[in-house]
Amino acid sequence: VFDMGGNAIRVPVDPAEYKHDDYYMWRYLDRVVTWAGEHDNYVIIDWDYTGNPIDGSGDEMPDIDDNPLDYSAEFWKNTAEYFKNTPNVIFEIYNEPVGMSDSEWKRCADSLISVIRSAGAKQLIIVGSPDYCYDLGWLDELGETNSNTAFSLHVYPDKVFWQKFMSGYVTSYPIVVTEWGYADDDVEVKNEKLKGTRNVFGIKFSSYLEKHDIGWIASSYDYKSEPAMFKNGYKNKTKWGEFVADLLGEKEEEQ
């Protein structure tokens, strides 16, 4: 990623894997953060829940007994204490909230932000949005924003009204896109909602992000996860991967 010109990676932490590995923090996160820091790059630690943190509902929720909100608080207490003096770490508190009202999500987000700050961590916190991290309308509930906090958005080709959803907020709030991408016609995908092209989706969306100075993380630097940037290993890029490399190369040249 960094050789391609990027300056940040997003590391998803699966709650079930974390639950069953007492050394997860040291075995994985510490090593990634150290490696990135040695090259002056950032790591976004993404707590990878997708669903309702209050009642645990959602088709993609992990098979563990803990209440998601309580377990999220436990994770962030431990993680914030561990990395509070590590400046290249960014905390993304919850991947994709689903099935809850704006006010309910605001209460959940406020509680997790408080846990992180109470642990002494002052780094940037990224807060997602309801409806699979797409509906920024909940920001109307905010009032005064927390210090050093940004708000994330996930956009794929099926979200055809993304500009309408973003336009009312990009000039008023610090927005960062922590997932976006598409699967071109050179790859087969299980999720047809990811199908898109450079011209119809990629150029339009990336140009909008550049115009409004919005940071982004492309998904996924992998050949298994969809939409993948690589084909059957890490040697040959998909059309999507080539487009990301072009975007990052352009940024590198401009700097």
PLM region spans:
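Extracellular glycoside hydrolase catalytic/binding regions
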Residues: D63-L69, A73-I90, Y94-E252
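Short secondary-structure boundary/hinge segments and terminal tails
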Residues: K19, P53-D55, D186, E226-P227
